[in-house]
Amino acid sequence: MKILRACCGLLLAALTLTACGQKPLLENVTLSPGVISPNADGKDDVARISFQLNRSARIWITFEDALGRTYVFRNATPLGRNEELYSVLFPGVVEGFLLPGEDVPFRITRRVLPDGVYTWKITATTDDGETVTHTGALTVENADTRLPEITGFSVYPKEFSPNQDGIDDRVTINLFLHKDVEELTVYMLDKEGVRHHIPEDERRTPLNTEGFHTFDYDGGIDAGAEPPPNGEYTVYAEARDAVGQRVLVTDTLTLVNAGRPMAYILNGEMTLKPTTLVISDTLCFTLTVENDSGTYLRTTGPWPGSTYRSDENFNALGYAEESGVFRVGLDFDTSLRNYPFRWGIGRPGVDLVQIGKYWYLPPFSRSEITGCVQIVEMPPRVSLYFWSGLIHEDVEIAAINNRVDPHLVEIWEP
């Protein structure tokens, strides 16, 4: 019994010594210098906060003004025990807040503390509820409190179809920046959190300077990228000044019929006949266009089956060039212009579907195209090559769709 009591006494003494020897949760806490002037002039702009954390805990760093209002610099940040001092620079900027009576058309995400005397508090709390707080004083003077305001934020059009069809292919975003900043960014965020950068039109106002700014977005399609999928997105404009203040404005944008258009003349083949004819005869072709993309292809007339005279072009039939439309063309050696004879890539209501007031070839579909040219004048030489092409007007004639399947044709006078 005496031995048992002695052992218990020794155990209790050991536990007491262990408890007494446990280090404080939070120690060696400093903030220096005690006076800062956060105005990006390079002098006393920041204070260094240092502390020793002896056990894992969540850390709060806050500032309280003379009226008892609290401003948050770090909020419940989890940190582990560390032999080295933790250190962080405080630039005078805290989580965004509004001044009494203030109403602004943007969200303030980071803001500098106004001039004044503040009580700083550094609090550590462990998972088992142990909490330690250290406090001190900080004076802020000559702070640059002017916000990098953004006003006049607009997104147009609100519904956007990046598919190079010439209809609502681009979005214009305008804003007015009220202060020179370190960074001005505009981006689109999808539901998965993927950010799509929107470039600025640098011809209007120098980057990051006060004034009117315009951003232009095509979904990346003009650079050969696949645009983001259809859906509703949030557009963000964010400005950050030299002090570190940030403001944010948002709007929504809906993508419809988005996709990179890809189409071909099927198998690179065209039927052309007759290959020998005389003046006043008619030369006719047949080919098939395949839409090999997940987007709709806009087209216009003249429609398949139309006949040209050889001294006409598509303008004569009342269908001028239109940016973004696909048309099949017929060309020949001595033509004075590129693909003077053109036809739509389908028939309205048969191969084509109507979207709004325009006609489109649906995704992953095919259409047979026919057309004729009546030869009404003698060309410069008897033997000529005729070939077909698939034109994406004001965009490109892809190499694979240019000079497709040339046929040698002889034209004679009667």
Regions found by a protein language model. Give the residues of each.
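Bacterial N-terminal signal peptides that target proteins for export
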Residues: M1-C8
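C-terminal motif of bacterial Sec signal peptides marking the signal peptidase cleavage site
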Residues: L17-A19
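Short, hydrophobic/aromatic beta-strand segments
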Residues: I59-F63, F73, E183-Y187, V249, ...
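Asparagine-centered strand-capping/turn motif at beta-strand->loop junctions
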Residues: T288-Y296
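Intrinsically disordered, low-complexity Pro/Gly/Ser/Thr-rich segments with frequent PxxP/GP/PP motifs
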Residues: R337-E377
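Terminal connector regions
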Residues: E377-W412
